[in-house]
From Swiss-Prot:
GO terms for biological process: translation. Belongs to the bacterial ribosomal protein bL21 family. NCBIfam families: L21. InterPro entries: bL21-like, bL21-like_sf, Ribosomal_bL21. This protein binds to 23S rRNA in the presence of protein L20. PANTHER family: 50S RIBOSOMAL PROTEIN L21 (PTHR21349), LARGE RIBOSOMAL SUBUNIT PROTEIN BL21M (PTHR21349:SF0). This is Large ribosomal subunit protein bL21. GO terms for molecular function: rRNA binding; structural constituent of ribosome. Keywords: Ribonucleoprotein, Ribosomal protein, RNA-binding, rRNA-binding. Part of the 50S ribosomal subunit. Contacts protein L20. GO terms for cellular component: cytoplasm; ribonucleoprotein complex; ribosome.
Length: 100
C-alpha cells in the first residue's frame, strides 16, 4: 500500500519503510508525526472523503542542509557579474505505517 502526502507545498509518494527528505519541520530526532494523505493506493485507489480516516505515521530521523546551489547573474557589456549561494534546510522522516 502507498500514499501521497503533502508537506511544505510539495507532494511525495510514500510507503512503509521509506525515508524521505521534506522541507524543514519542527521537532527533534525521534519525534513522531501524523500526516494526512491526499491519496491512498494499493488494491484499490482511495481519495477525497474516502481517505479522511487514514493516517500516515512518520518519525523524524534528522535535520540537515542540502547541497550548495550557486546563482549567477550576468549582464553583457557592463561588467555586471554576481554570484550568491544557498543551502536549503531539510528534515529526513521515516514512514512507519499507513493506517486507516
Amino acid at each position: 500500500m502507498f500514499a501521497i502526502i503533502q508537506t511544505g507545498g510539495k507532494q511525495y509518494r510514500v510507503q512503509e519503510g521509506d525515508v524521505i527528505r521534506v522541507e524543514n519541520l519542527k521537532g527533534e530526532a525521534g519525534d513522531k508525526l501524523d500526516l494526512t494523505p491526499l491519496f491512498v493506493g494499493g488494491d484499490q485507489a482511495l481519495f477525497g472523503d474516502a481517505v479522511s480516516n487514514f493516517v500516515v505515521n512518520a518519525e523524524v530521523v534528522e535535520h540537515g542542509r542540502g547541497p550548495k546551489i550557486y546563482i549567477r547573474k550576468y549582464k553583457s557589456g557592463v561588467q555586471y557579474r554576481r554570484r550568491t549561494g544557498h543551502r536549503q534546510d531539510y528534515t529526513a522522516i521515516k514512514i512507519l505505517g499507513i493506517k486507516g
